[in-house]
Every structure is written in C-alpha cells, then in structure tokens.
Amino acid sequence: MKTETDFFDQATIVVRAGNGGNGAATFRREKYVPRGGPNGGDGGRGGHVYLIADPEYNTLLHFRYQRKFVAENGGHGGKNAMHGRNGTDVYVPVPPGTVVRATIDGVTYSVDLARPGQRLLAARGGRGGLGNIHFATSTRQAPRLAELGEPGQELTLELELKMLADVGLVGFPNAGKSTLLSVISAARPKIAAYPFTTLTPNLGIVEVGLQRFVVADIPGLIEGAHAGVGLGHDFLRHVERTRLLIHIIDAAGVDGRYPWDDYEQINTELRLYQPELAQRKQVVALNKADLPAAQENLPILRERLPVAPEDLFVISAATGEGIEPLLRRVADLLRADPPPQRDPVDPDEPPLQWPLPEVDENAFTIEREGEAFRVRGIKIERLIAMSNLDQDEALDRIQRVLEASGINEALIAAGVQDGDLVRIGRAELVWDDSGQHAL
C-alpha cells in the first residue's frame, strides 16, 4: 500500500529516572536481643528510563505532545530485612535511525539507535539506600543509621531522526522534486512555485513490479547549504542515510539559472557537507522536458554533464514522460546494492549506554567558591546525597569518610580556616580547627 508520511524529525525531551528507595532503620523485637537488633531492609532501585528503536514509528511526531518521561521511584526498605520494590522502568519508543544526544558534565555524547529493538539506557535509576542491618558492628550493635535512596538521573535529550529512505530526491528549489514524488507514490507534498515550499522531507513508497522502496523528497538546496544557508544543515542531514540519489535538474532553467551550473552547485554542496556524499550513486533526471526551453538545452546538457548515458534521463513530472524508465533504472541499482542487513536486536542483548570515560570514583577536587570551599567527587557526593544530614550517626559516618579519603588533609593544604564553609553536594559543613574536620 502506498502511503504518505507527515515528518517531524527533531525533538527535545526530558527523561528522569526514579529515586532509589530509602533504607529502613528498624529492630527485631526479641527477648534478650539489645534493642531487638537491627533488621532494616534496603530500599529498591529507582526505575530506569530507556529509549527503544521501534519500527512502528517513523517520525518523532509523538514528542510534540509529551516531552517529559519519569520513571517510578524505588520502594522503601522494611522491617525484617524486607527489600523495597524496584521502580518500574519506562520505555520511550523512537523510530529506528534516531540519533540521541545528551550533555553530561559539560561533554556531549551521542548514541545511534539504528536497529529495531535497540535500547539505550538513557537515565539510570538511583540506588536503593542501605538499611541499618548493614551498619551493625561489634561496638555498635543497635545502629539507627540507614541511607536515603540515591536520586535518579535526569537528562535533557536532543533527538534527531536521520531517515532510512532508500532514495533521496535532491536539486534546487522548484526543480520538480515534490511533483515527481507525488507522481511516483501516494505522497501528497505541498507544491507551489516559490522557494522552500517543502520545508520538511516527504516520504513516499514506490512500487516497481514486485519491488518496493522508500523515496524521500529532500527540501531544495541552494548555494551555501553546507554552511547552513537556507536551512541547509537541516536539509542535508537527511541525505546521509539514503542509498541512492535522484538528482533532479530544471532543464528549462525557469528560474533564470543555467541548468548545467545547477548540477555542479548541488554536488559541490554535497561534497562540502560530507565528502562521502559526493561519491553516492546518482541518476540524473532532466525535468520539465515538456517546455520548449528544456528541449533547447538538452543537447548542451547531454554534452556537459559528466553522467553516463544509462544514468541520464529526460523526464517531465508534469506529463509523466520518461518516468517509467527512470524508476526501472533506480530499482535495478537498488537491487544490485542491497542495504546492510539490520536484523532486529536480540531481546537479551544488553542495552547501549552513554560512552562515558572511565573515572576514578574515589577522586575528588577542591576549589574556592567565594569565601567557601567546594569539594567535588563522585563517591563523596553520592554519600552526601544518600545521607540524612539531621542524623548524628550519618554525620559521624561522613566525617570518617572525609578523613579516610584524604579530603580533610587536602582541605588543610588548600588553606581552610576555622569557621570556613565546606560545601559538598547539598551539604554545607563548617570547618572546626580543633578537631581538624568539617562539622
């Protein structure tokens, strides 16, 4: 069945994973056991947010109506060492061919979801907090210490769909691309005699005998498109994944340009945008052959264009002249160069993750922040986030970690003075010279 597709190819969404559940501080109620003994269970993990390449989708239109996706928080731990329930994961469908970008710690990362079923762990759920059962020692037999759940990750994602069309129609505005697409498929693009009538790609399914392929009408390119002139970047990126190009030229020169110059300029823009595009297989369609000016130009075009005769076609999208042999040639070329196999992903295949560099979680930095000192580090900031700062046992634990990790020593070397503020995550501690630590 021939179809028309509305196109929506860029979107910005926010994904927020669930927070981990809090650990419990509970005690057994048994005779002869001090305070009953700790038996608080751990909190559950917060739900993850995944993006999944779903072949049922072919645009990003659904993100026009929903832009924020939030996973469930983990359940809190309970008595009798009961573990909290893990939060339910959220799966956000995107069309295959979607490139996902996120900026994490000032660095932008991208992941390509090209294969059906491919998943990206976009936002990781927070760890569940440990219950007090983990903090019992020979000297602390009834600890009231339990961790809070770790906050879930929240990211803003930029989505860009690079279409998976087989054939791209390229050419100057008003060369006749939209008219041709409307003739060879059931697509109904907007058609009018002024530049940039087509501002988004239109897709059409073309049938040649038993063969079917997808054709994309790439919005008209102009000189300077590779540098973004005339929305050039928005247009050119859709050419990247096509297997073959039909280069349509207004052979009549209706807009006052020389048709042979149009050919050179479009190929120059393709080459400057991405050198590989200049090597992409092309067939050239000299359109508007029903006009007298085109008939006058055809001998010159055949002589000047560096195109093999079998790849040069004289057509009229308005009358249908020459279209059938053009499509047969396109079908033959596609059949001779099948697309790379994109088998669906095995459901057991692990999800893709952001390609973050390996880091030492124990590492930390100290910098001045006005009159205060700011300590940054993955492990120490996670500890702060998962600590109840109103609880004495939690503060004692933080102090032990600051001392054991070398942070206190580094603060002294950085010039911390009695009464100075020391900020770590959400915590503001006051340095105490007498004890050589922050409180």
From Swiss-Prot:
Its EC number is 3.6.5.-. Its cofactor is Mg(2+). Residues 165-335 form the OBG-type G domain. The keyword Transmembrane does not apply. InterPro entries: G_OBG, GTP-bd, GTP-bd_Obg/CgtA, GTP-bd_prot_GTP1/OBG_C_sf, GTP1-OBG_CS, GTP1_OBG_dom, GTP1_OBG_dom_sf, OBG_GTPase. It is found in: Cytoplasm. Mg(2+) binds at residues 178, 198. GTP binds at residues 171-178, 196-200, 217-220, 287-290, 316-318. GO terms for biological process: ribosome biogenesis. GO terms for cellular component: cytoplasm. Residues 5-164 form the Obg domain. Keywords: Cytoplasm, GTP-binding, Hydrolase, Magnesium, Metal-binding, Nucleotide-binding. Residues 356-433 form the OCT domain. It comes from the Bacteria. One of its GO terms (molecular function) is GTPase activity. Its main location: cytoplasm. It is an enzyme of class 3 (hydrolase). An essential GTPase which binds GTP, GDP and possibly (p)ppGpp with moderate affinity, with high nucleotide exchange rates and a fairly low GTP hydrolysis rate. Plays a role in control of the cell cycle, stress response, ribosome biogenesis and in those bacteria that undergo differentiation, in morphogenesis control. Belongs to the TRAFAC class OBG-HflX-like GTPase superfamily. OBG GTPase family. NCBIfam families: Obg_CgtA, Obg_CgtA_exten, PRK12296.1, PRK12297.1, PRK12299.1. HAMAP family: GTPase_Obg (MF_01454). Monomer. This is GTPase Obg. The gene is obg.
